[in-house]
Amino acid sequence: LSTFRKALSFSINRQSYITRFEPTSDIGLGLLNDLYIYNPDTGEAYRDTDAAKETILKAQDYYEKDGVWYNVHDEAQGSLDDAYDSLTGFDLSHAADLMEQAYQEAVHEGIYDGEPVVITYCTVGSGVSENLQALIDMINGMLADVIAACDQPTFKSVSLKVQLYADEATYWEALKAGKMDLSFSTWGGSAMDPWGIIYSCYIDSANSNNFGFDSVAKGIGITINYNGKDVAASLYDWAAWLYNAQSDNQYDKTNLYEVLGVAVGEAEYDFKLEVLAQCELAQLQTYSNLPIFYSYITSLRSAQYNNGSDYYVNNMIGYGGIRHIYYNYSDAQWSNFVQGHNGNLESYYTAS
């Protein structure tokens, strides 16, 4: 049930998770992180655009009225940027409401027998590590809090248990065949060309880790205005167009290359941006994937040298690279400098 998966998503306190397990990372609520550049001519990141921010807000059940964004509890959160910056992905009361709704749907469809709901979390290994057990315990604690917060009939309990696969090959075979309830994965690539991400990672049956989602995507409709005309097609076909599909056999029903009269590489960036944002939203709203965090690399810096930029530009430029590094001290000068501070530069770094 998508409602049950949605309840799981709102149950997870992502800040608590990354503080414990991924301290250099950040809360992630989208399918593309901050590194994806939608316009290489200007270096503009997809995640920084209004369209991409609206996608995440809508996936989190926010809505806009007269320029002000409101959360699911009808509480004003301010402008688009203010509302976006306030997102955490965690909402205990909303998760409880969704869990109650999922329970009613499960009972109505005859798929709940009154017993505890146990979700199998699958991974590779010969045993459950201390870190993995801590992760399972944390998530189970969050799920227990949601069940306790329900004031209407709901599931007896919801929890995770671990199932181990002995090797990577067996694990990935089972994943692609849909033989597991839950897995934890990360993927990406082509940061300067994000258009094919939705199709290749989430829809294409040959490559996707979402078992059977290609057929689901064919039933999700998206309408986008192109040159003053509304064009309706499935998520599958819009994602295929972004993947540069041109022949009929690459589409399900609507050959958007012919309908639009333009390939993705020739289309205006603003239009491609709108298509990507709408596809990401449609995929997020299936709750087949529950984004948790954006993974980042953290490095220590030294007062011995300066990068070309104090700020990370993008994944192609970084902080300017080796050619733009300049040294403030030679090795000998640096050694003397450190010794002059008795080996403790805390006050120096704090002041700077």
Residue ranges and their predicted role:
Residues 25, 62-189, 297:
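Ligand/substrate-recognition segments at binding pockets and active sites
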Residues 19-24, 29-33, 131-136, 193-198, ...:
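Short, solvent-exposed loop/turn and secondary-structure capping segments
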Residues 9, 96, 136, 140, ...:
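Generic hydrophobic alpha-helical scaffold/packing signal
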Residues 185-204:
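Extended, charge-rich low-complexity interaction segments
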Residues 1-72, 83-90, 115-127, 252, ...:
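Alpha-helical secondary-structure segments
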Residues 37-93, 112, 173-174, 199-258, ...:
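Short, solvent-exposed loop/beta-turn-alpha elements that line the ligand-binding surface or hinge
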Residues 162, 279, 292-294, 309-310:
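Compact beta-rich and alpha/beta scaffold cores in large eukaryotic transport/transcription complexes
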